[in-house]
């Protein structure tokens, strides 16, 4: 009996180690593809990265949601079987979501039923599949071993178990081994030493009839292909079936298996010469020893081969994962996901006293994380259609951008229909808070303002040219420039930002969005935007920084001149050889006139009507940092009123007072 017990234990280990992983991911190839880095890709990353927290936040560990607008809307489902811990469930869904992001590079649909550390389900698609019974594409896996027991008896027991479980799962009745979300786990005695353990799950959105049909078809398919194997799995987009001869899941921990029938007496045949001595212990010992001598080395050898194979497989998988990560240009955002409860606690439940301000897309709150870090929490408005687009852009774009003159994104939250961005907290608020407040203007002397102009220029240059992506901000304005404790500028608010292709120079849109006072003429009137439209906005910003006045105001040189905005006012002053009248009076005489004049000159070059006439950012930075470059005469700015009352200086003439006369520079 001892030898038999040893043999049973070794068989158990053989079965356990011989089973393949049940996870088989399907990146559907016949449902279309999407453009990497495009809007669908952005939406897919957002919904998959937030799926673990969204699922575990639900009492039933089931989440069905979507993000975006057609044709780039992404639908997703995540779920775990009943009894799963939140930690195991989150881990399972996170691993599978990461797999899809790395290994389904442009497929618009994929699904998987991974089994570790618990059984979970992840699916995404560009079309709604809620309530739809999808039987294809189908996958199956089998145990490597064959059945040793009577196949006819096994089939009878297996079919009885399958029928009982399909009925329990599809009728959605809660029993000790099933729940009301189309799930069932059960077992049946096969032999005194072996039980059949089976687990079934349909997606909870299916009707009872569709669930039954899906599971029954899976059972039929398995019988057709693999009925002699010791275990197997059939996976479809809408249902899952697995059975095996060992407890592969904690779902079976509380199951009570019916007691096996009494074990029949075992008769050991004796050699013919010893028939008169039925109690010959030597002969009996030799037979058992032979069995053990043959069985143990064989099983150990198989185990060694399996372990070696497993180690080699893991090494190969690790290499492939490292290679995929190193080749991917898009950083995953999973590590940046915050749960809603954390953000709610950080902002004192979005208390009014924590509110820093409010814009067109939502409110901004000051928060403090549990580790003591101060953060700025941007809670997008649920009523704003633009808010959804803003969230998608900011959450993905800003994670790719690292520059001292760009605000840093710490994370985001996409739960309970909330869209929240968590930024580093910048202590001195935004530029407009100081620039347009008569009591605070004096805190920004010319030295600080000149430093701010240079920092903004370097930040835009990074967006346009120096980052891995070519990004047009499209909403540069004083309220989107934050100031840190040392008054260093940080560009923020990437809700309208657009990624350009390597060779792309211009984009077009029918949806004009942003702040009109900073818009270039070609964008405001025709929806055309490019790097040159950002440069126009930069020029407006420079004039505001120098003057302490808003471009949206109305200004005129004297009673006889036509009123205009700050840009036209600055252009008139320039052409009438009195640009320093633009300077903020709070400076007094504490500024260098040549430095200020040069900045006004550069700003007027940036706001020229023709985009081709505006300098590139690399040229602008050279103009700001070098006095040896001769600047061209600025042409008329955009929206300039052609008034006969205005006396213009000839386009071809230059004044020594307003242009540097050293070596020429061509942009």
UniProtKB/Swiss-Prot annotation:
Topological domain spans for side Cytoplasmic: 314-667
Residues the record marks as carrying a glycan: 37, 54, 64, 106, 126, 150, 254, 281
GO terms, biological process: defense response to bacterium; response to oxidative stress
Phosphoserine modification, residue list: 479
Record: residues binding ATP: 356-364, 378
Class of this enzyme: transferase
Modified residues (Phosphotyrosine): 423, 523
Signal sequence, renumbered to the chain: 1-24
Any single GO CC term annotated in Swiss-Prot or TrEMBL for this entry: membrane
Amino acid composition bias (Pro residues), ranges on this chain: 259-268
SMART domains noted in UniProt: S_TKc
Parts of the chain that traverse the membrane: 293-313
Gene name for this UniProt entry: CRK11
Catalytic machinery residues: 475
Region: Disordered, residue numbers: 259-282
Tissue and organ distribution: Detected in root, stem, leaf and flower.
Name of the featured protein: Cysteine-rich receptor-like protein kinase 11
């Amino acid at each position: 009996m001892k030898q038999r017990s040893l043999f049973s234990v070794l068989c158990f280990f053989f079965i356990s180690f011989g089973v393949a992983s049940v996870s088989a991911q399907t990146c559907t190839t016949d449902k279309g593809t999407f453009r990497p880095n495009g809007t669908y890709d952005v939406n897919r990353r957002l919904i998959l990265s937030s799926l673990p927290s969204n699922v575990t936040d639900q009492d039933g560990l089931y989440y069905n949601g979507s993000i975006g607008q057609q044709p780039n809307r992404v639908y997703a489902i995540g779920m775990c079987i009943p009894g799963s811990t939140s930690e195991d469930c989150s881990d399972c869904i996170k691993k599978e979501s990461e797999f899809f992001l790395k290994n389904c590079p442009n497929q618009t649909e994929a699904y998987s039923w991974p089994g570790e550390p618990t059984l979970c389900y992840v699916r995404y698609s560009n079309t709604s599949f809620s309530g739809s019974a999808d039987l294809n594409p189908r996958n199956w896996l089998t145990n490597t071993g064959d059945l040793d027991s009577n196949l006819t008896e096994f089939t009878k027991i297996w079919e009885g178990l399958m029928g009982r479980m399909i009925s329990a799962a599809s009728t959605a009745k809660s029993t000790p081994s099933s729940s009301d979300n189309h799930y069932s786990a059960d077992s049946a005695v096969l032999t005194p030493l072996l039980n059949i353990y089976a687990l079934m799950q349909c997606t909870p959105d299916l009707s009872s009839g569709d669930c039954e049909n899906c599971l029954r078809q899976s059972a039929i398919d398995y019988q057709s292909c693999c009925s002699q194997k010791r275990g197997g799995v059939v996976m479809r987009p809408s249902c899952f079936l697995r059975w095996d001869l060992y407890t592969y899941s904690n779902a079976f921990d509380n199951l009570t298996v019916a007691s096996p029938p009494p074990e029949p007496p075992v008769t050991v045949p004796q050699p013919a010469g010893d028939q008169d001595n039925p109690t010959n212990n030597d002969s009996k010992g030799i037979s058992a020893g032979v069995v053990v001598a043959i069985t143990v080395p064989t099983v150990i050898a198989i185990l060694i081969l399996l372990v070696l194979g497993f180690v080699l497989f893991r090494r190969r998988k690790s290499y492939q994962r490292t290679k995929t990560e190193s080749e991917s240009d898009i950083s995953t955002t999973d590590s940046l996901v915050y749960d809603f409860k954390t953000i709610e606690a950080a902002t004192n439940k979005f208390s009014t006293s924590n509110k820093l301000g409010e814009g067109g897309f939502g409110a901004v709150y000051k928060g403090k994380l549990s580790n003591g870090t101060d953060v700025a929490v941007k809670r997008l408005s649920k009523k704003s259609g633009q808010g959804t687009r803003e969230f998608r852009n900011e959450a993905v774009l800003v994670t790719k951008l690292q520059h001292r003159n760009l605000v840093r994104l710490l994370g985001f939250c996409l739960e309970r229909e909330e869209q929240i961005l968590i930024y580093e907290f910048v202590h001195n608020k935004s530029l407009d808070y100081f620039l347009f407040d008569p009591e605070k203007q004096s805190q920004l002397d010319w030295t600080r303002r000149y430093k701010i102009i240079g920092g903004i220029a370097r930040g835009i240059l990074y967006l346009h040219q120096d980052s891995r992506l070519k990004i047009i901000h499209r909403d540069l304005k004083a309220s989107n420039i934050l100031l840190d404790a040392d008054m260093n500028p940080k560009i923020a608010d990437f809700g309208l930002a657009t990624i350009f292709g390597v060779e792309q120079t211009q984009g077009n849109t029918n949806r004009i969005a942003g702040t009109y006072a900073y818009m270039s003429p070609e964008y405001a009137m025709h929806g055309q935007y490019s790097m040159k439209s950002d440069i126009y906005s930069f020029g407006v910003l420079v004039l505001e920084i120098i003057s302490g006045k808003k471009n949206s105001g109305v200004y005129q040189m004297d009673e006889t001149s036509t009123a205009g905005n700050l840009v036209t006012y600055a252009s008139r002053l320039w052409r009438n050889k009195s640009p320093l009248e633009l300077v903020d009076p709070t400076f007094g005489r504490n500024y260098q006139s040549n430095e200020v004049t040069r900045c006004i000159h550069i700003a007027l070059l940036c706001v020229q009507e023709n985009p081709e006439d505006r300098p590139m950012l690399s040229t602008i930075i050279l103009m700001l940092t070098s006095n040896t470059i001769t600047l061209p005469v600025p042409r008329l700015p955009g929206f300039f009123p052609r008034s006969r009352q205005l006396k213009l200086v000839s386009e071809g003439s230059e004044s020594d007072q307003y242009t540097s006369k050293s070596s020429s520079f061509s942009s």
